[in-house]
Amino acid sequence: SSGIGQAAALALSSPNNRLILVSMKNKEGLENTANKAKEKGANVLTFSADVSDYEACKSLLAQANEHFGPIDLLINNAGISHIGLFQDMTPDEWQRVMNVNIGSVMNLCHLVIPSMVHRHHGRIINISSVWGNVGASCEAVYSASKGAINSFTKALAKELAPSNIQVNAIAFGAIETPMNAWLSKEEAEALADEIPAGREGTKEE
């Protein structure tokens, strides 16, 4: 509905392509993305669902299969962050980020893999972050969740390779998206100074 997810959806939008777009809260953004994808000729089905909920994932995929058939490409992009000292986090805040960031990946992979294995074909792309490799101060849970995605992706890639299913993760650096909109001008400039290109990446890139 925004950011990297929206850019990926539009990049995949072309005549006869069938897209299933999911967002939990941003219904306006979801509708906007769907309309842009349709303008490019794609067939689009949208769902408002919490992908950290296994039963919600099961329901939306059942409906998607009924409309479009089995999933060929799964992009796991759901993600939230929590900024602050680890010692100030509550267990519920920690669990919520983990549920969305890694729980959603496991839910959707678990539900689409059987069909992919049966058809001996499938592609899975998990959206990760450089913080999953190096960690980020005051983003302990976000870093942990992305590190989990990286390890899960490597393990699943080995497990599914004999079934002709490719599993990869993209560990983005700093990208100009709504998730980073909270940065002050000074913080954004300091972040840009640490990037060789001297700026954040764009979602289109």
Residues covered by each model-derived region:
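Active-site loop immediately N-terminal to the catalytic Tyr-X3-Lys motif
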Residues: 86-87, 134-140, 162-163, 198
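Alpha-helical segment proximal to the catalytic Tyr-Lys
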Residues: 114, 158-162
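Residue(s) in the substrate-gating loop at a strand-loop-helix junction
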Residues: 129
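Conserved glycine-rich cofactor-binding loop
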Residues: 1-2
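Substrate-binding pocket helix/loop in short-chain dehydrogenase/reductase
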Residues: 85-86, 93-95, 180, 187, ...
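Conserved glycine-rich Rossmann-like NAD(P)H-binding loop of the short-chain dehydrogenase/reductase
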Residues: 15-31
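Active-site helix of classical SDR
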Residues: 109, 145, 153
